[in-house]
Amino acid sequence: MRHTIRTTLAAGALAALTALATLAIPSRGEAADGVDAIKQRGTLIVGVKADYKPFGFRDPSGTIIGLEPDLAADLAKRLGVKLELVPVVSANRIEFLQQGKVDLLIATLSDKPERRRVVQAIDPQYYSDFVNVLLPKTSGITDWAQLKGKPLCATSGAWYNKDVARTYGAEIIAFDGSEKPLFALKQGNCLGYVYDQSMLQGKLLDDDWKAGYALPLKGILDAPWMMAVAQGNATLQAMVENATKDWMKTGFIVDEEKKWGIEPTAYSKAMHEKYKNATN
């Protein structure tokens, strides 16, 4: 009887320990808290854009590719784990990070104080971009002041929508993602599409757009882009910050811009100059 009780208790204790160990290892598709947990799981989960060529978009097979997925792949390689990319849009990317659906955001996230209050920003910022408007070549628009009272398609959640409306008097018509406002622009539902300049430059690499559209205005509202992890995830923060400095030291991001047909930005070149001779 005593032997049976001891055996039962031992089996119960083993089962409990096994359950605890299982709970301690994040499952695939569930964000991990810290570098060690990511290594245990064997996968780094990164939120990226899938409709933002050339920073994150789908190839003909449906695979997400682009400059930011390349950065994510480099981080996964440094960690020695596999990479899982989760598509996000401007309106849900921070929510996905807060809900633990992703470990890290590399998703054209402009650096704003209100965002730093709810996520852990990665410093230094990895990129910087202007705001611009994709317009038909026949629009006759040559100055931002001419946009007063004009309808502009926009992406929901973009921080500059209110600034453009308030400063220049444009009427903002917001859509989810970037494909819907681009479609609306082609349908004539708005005069132009206000968005990140680099993405609009990417669209003009496509024959479908460069024939009839252009960026006649000077870019405004220059804003750095930041990567982000969940608040309190200090080990992943440190790892990504060290990698970012290494990218700047080696010129990796400048090379990525060239790879994806982007004219290297003044920011990328300046950060490479700043870090290329750094010793740590």
What are these regions (language model features)?
Residues 31-108:
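Extracytoplasmic small-molecule ligand-binding "clamshell" domains
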Residues 33, 160-175, 211-216, 244-280:
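Ligand-binding clefts/hinges and TM-proximal coupling segments of bilobed small-molecule sensing domains
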Residues 44-45, 80-82, 99-107, 150-151, ...:
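Alpha-to-beta junction loops
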Residues 45-54, 64-77, 110, 130-180, ...:
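Bilobed "Venus flytrap"/periplasmic-binding protein-like clamshell domains
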Residues 69, 84-95, 157-159, 173-187, ...:
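Short helix-initiation/N-cap motifs at beta->coil->alpha
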Residues 70-78, 138-141, 145-146, 150-151, ...:
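Extended ligand-binding regions for polar small-molecule ligands
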Residues 73, 77, 82-146, 211-213, ...:
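Acidic, polar ligand-binding/catalytic clefts
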Residues 127-135, 197, 201, 205-244, ...:
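Periplasmic-binding protein-like
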